């Protein structure tokens, strides 16, 4: 049994410690906002926050999480998250939407840490997120 704190709630899941966090989030907890894209931490669709930092949940095992606090797209809140989500919609960013949760999670982490990022900061923070339909 593995103990996880997801979105501020404590869970105990019956999982092998090597199970990717992504599958615990989606299959065991039913939180499907976090997407599976490539499975090799290259596309960013599976991005969640671990203690406020963006990580790729497809390559992070539940055993690696330890006492960390995981936040998924379902639970991001606060002014930064609300602003990013509003601008995302206002600027018609979503097309197919597959990359959207990972893109938003990376953007929220960036703006939370750096209120005035440069173009280079933005490129660096978002470079791990790929968009299948190329609308980003």
Please place each PLM-identified region on the residue numbering:
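Signature of N-terminal electron-transfer/Fe-S-associated modules in redox systems
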Residues: 1-136
